[in-house]
Amino acid sequence: IAFYDLDWAFQTRSNCFFNLIGSEQTAQIAPTIRWLFGIDDFKERLLTRYAELTETTLSDEHVTEKIDGFRALLAPEIARERAHWGGSEEGWNEQVDALRANIADDYAAHTVRNLCDALGVGEEERMEYFGF
């Protein structure tokens, strides 16, 4: 399944959803997702790959490191950016802090549970793929 609008998806837990199969609001995505689930081993491959990603690229630790790195990279430019577009450096820092806190609070496990719920994966099968 494709990532989209990652700043929105990572910002709050309520934005972490997988309702792409039947929602009429996502009609451009739903046919593709339905087609993929028609492939015999797609669900297994999806769960296996997501398990790998939540241990590496999408792990809470890795994502918070990326947030910290981008914060350090962008911090010198924020005063100029806010002067042009409005807002304050303090407001920017508050948003970055909120994003970081959301990820640091076991976000990967939250996404795993949402994904498993959406796919009808029970606790035993979730344990096999994700270890919890």
Label each region the model flagged.
Residues 1-132:
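Middle-to-C-terminal accessory/interaction subdomains
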